[in-house]
Amino acid sequence: MAKAAEILDKFGISYEMRIISAHRMPDTFFEYAQTAEERGVKVIIAGAGMAAHLPGMCAALFPMPVIGIPMHTTSLGGRDSLYSIVQMPSGIPVATVAINGGANAGILAAKILAVSDPELLAKLKDYSAEMKDGVLKKDAKLQECGYHNYTK
């Protein structure tokens, strides 16, 4: 979740961050999800482990996009979380990123918001260009020194 927050901060996107359990505090969860739209929330990023019902329940109650982050678990390495989040019934979609994929969740949220925000879209384009430049620099270094010396 920290990686998602770092990305949102990088793009200047305001957000709420809470620790809420759909199982251990259902009343608080229902109130949060049902009032998110009136608070101005446009996208929910929900991380969950094990049974991982939080993102799906958010999607059932919140009328706008929900991004689920399956969290790594000790018993099954996060696969339980991944399957729980990705296997949603028809009509209740949850966009799902990789296990512990907070950074991509933040980027996906930014891209969703950028549909109606040209300034944010420009920042995302700059971010993509920065990533491309980073790869080009790594390739130039590889071409210059060869693979034997690349990581030394």
Label each PLM-derived region with a short phrase.
Residues 1-2, 25-28, 48-57, 76-79, ...:
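Short glycine/serine/threonine-rich phosphate/pyrophosphate-binding segments
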Residues 3-4, 79-152:
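C-terminal binding/interaction regions
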Residues 5-10, 29-33, 60, 77-89:
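Active-site-proximal loop->helix
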Residues 13-16, 40, 64, 86-94:
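Glycine/charged-rich beta-loop-alpha catalytic/anionic-binding loops adjacent to active sites
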